[in-house]
Regions:
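Short, surface-exposed coil-to-beta transition loops
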Residues: 3-5, 61-65, 87-91
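Glycine-rich portal/gate segments that line the openings of hydrophobic small-molecule binding cavities
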Residues: 38-85, 102, 132-151
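Preference for bulky hydrophobic residues occupying beta-strand positions
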Residues: 6-8, 53-55, 79, 92, ...
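Amphipathic alpha-helical segments that line or abut small-molecule/effector binding pockets
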Residues: 15-18, 131, 135
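Structural motif
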Residues: 11, 71-73, 97-99
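Beta-strand/loop substructures that line and gate deep hydrophobic ligand-binding cavities in soluble
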Residues: 80-132, 148-149
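Hydrophobic ligand-binding cavity/cleft-lining segments
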Residues: 1-41, 46, 153
């Protein structure tokens, strides 16, 4: 299994930060490893809400459908995805910090089937992907949001 964990600071209030991150389609705005993202279910984000992300994988594009498995409003969201090639899980925690927030992000990827034998080889590449995503997230959370990114109240 490959794991990447990071902590970043947000200039935005914790509630707005959480809303922005829980709307997982926003990953396409800050994670350079996400080519496209869409919410598959209508309505607010809740347990069971699904998001399709298109990511590069082994030189091709792969669609992953993430589903919200845990949601503690304003505090924590856990999403999981599974394909025939891999399993992924992302856990996001948001804590108030003054006028802003602290975000702890953990992403795990585990290869499946015959590829599982290569799991340890995934770690260095996943670390580099995580570092680029963290830089993008830190930039997004330090920047005033434009109207299409702003959380919906």
């Amino acid at each position: 299994m490959a794991r990447y964990a990071a902590t970043v600071t947000s200039q935005h209030p914790a509630a707005d930060t959480f809303s922005y991150l829980a709307t997982f389609t926003n990953t396409a705005d800050w994670d350079p490893g996400v080519i496209a993202a869409e919410q598959l279910d209508s309505g607010p984000v809740r347990p069971g809400t699904r998001f399709r992300l298109v990511v590069p994988f082994l030189g091709r594009r792969m669609a992953l459908t993430y589903q919200v498995v845990t949601l503690v409003p304003g505090r924590e969201i856990v999403l999981a995805a599974s394909s025939r090639l891999l399993r992924a899980a992302d856990r996001i925690l948001v804590d108030p910090a003054g006028d802003g927030a602290t975000v702890s992000y953990q992403a795990d990827v585990r290869l499946r089937g015959p590829l599982a034998l290569l799991d340890t080889l995934l770690r260095p590449g996943f670390r580099a992907i995580g570092q680029r995503a963290t830089a993008g997230l830190a930039h997004a959370l330090a920047t005033p949001w434009v109207s299409h990114q702003a959380p919906q109240s």
